[in-house]
């Protein structure tokens, strides 16, 4: 069975980020940094300069989307893998690269940092970025523990910085349409049951189980649609390929 600590983290993650969840996408993230209602244009004087830490599987997609977003430009990429850095340079010759993420978080020429690395490294990198005055965009899952998540939120609030998690499904047309139907003056009626299944998606992770890897998607959708906290839960799981990490789970 999955531990209570593991399951409660995922539920708490959705609850913690309710106040900022609407700002998760890049198009929403950028105006928030400068307290503007309209998306910044590339020809405006202000351009959000973003450093991306991690250029493995998901990092290239984040870099592409940032560079396709008005008002933003990736100016630096950090990755421990030299081949990954070379790929970034070939794709974007104007981007600087480095092996040490500290070079990015300490740079005065970077406004915000996107953390696209294994979850075990999220806390250290995000904390360092905040301490160096950078806004932070973190790939899900946010951190490894509730205490780490709360510490990062407190650090951001103390410094009046933005920190948010990449709950991408909250901005898909289907999820937003469901939200619209649910909230349309009771047109649908009272919602009694919510069921979500996520199967056969991607590789097995070496550092987190399937709940930590995939459940944040479903839990963030549930939190967005229902806006209610759970009263109780039951969870079970099994590990078939790695005896320490469950690859099948039911909550």
Where do the model's predicted regions map?
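A contiguous active-site-proximal alpha/beta segment in oxidoreductase catalytic domains
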Residues: 19, 143-205
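Beta-loop-alpha module in the N-terminal Rossmann-like domain of NAD(P)-dependent dehydrogenases
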Residues: 62, 92-155
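Extreme N-terminal basic, low-complexity initiation segments
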Residues: 2-14
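Rossmann-like dinucleotide-binding domain that binds NAD(P)(H)
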Residues: 201-251
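N-terminal Rossmann-like dinucleotide-binding module
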Residues: 29, 42-92
């Amino acid at each position: 069975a999955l531990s209570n600590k593991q399951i409660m983290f995922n539920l708490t993650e959705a609850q913690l980020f309710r106040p900022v969840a609407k700002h998760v996408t890049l198009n929403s993230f950028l105006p928030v940094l400068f307290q503007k209602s309209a998306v910044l244009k590339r020809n405006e004087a202000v351009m959000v300069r973003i450093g991306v830490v991690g250029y493995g599987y998901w990092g290239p997609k984040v870099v592409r989307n940032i560079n396709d977003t008005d008002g933003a430009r990736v100016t630096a990429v950090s990755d421990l893998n030299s081949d990954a850095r070379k790929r970034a340079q070939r794709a974007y010759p104007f981007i600087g690269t480095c092996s040490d993420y500290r070079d990015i978080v300490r740079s005065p020429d970077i406004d915000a940092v996107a953390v696209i690395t294994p979850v075990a490294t999220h806390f250290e990198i995000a904390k360092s970025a905040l301490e160096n005055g950078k806004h932070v965009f973190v790939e899900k899952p946010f951190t490894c523990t509730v205490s780490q998540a709360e510490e990062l939120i407190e650090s951001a609030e103390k410094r009046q910085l933005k920190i948010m998690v990449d709950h991408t499904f909250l901005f898909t047309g289907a999820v937003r349409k469901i939200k619209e139907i649910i909230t349309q003056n009771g047109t649908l009626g009272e919602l009694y049951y919510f069921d979500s299944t996520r199967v056969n998606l991607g590789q097995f992770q070496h550092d987190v189980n399937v709940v930590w890897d995939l459940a944040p998607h479903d839990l963030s959708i549930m939190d967005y649609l229902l806006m209610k906290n759970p009263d109780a839960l039951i969870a079970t799981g099994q590990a078939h390929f790695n005896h320490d990490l469950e690859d099948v789970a039911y909550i």
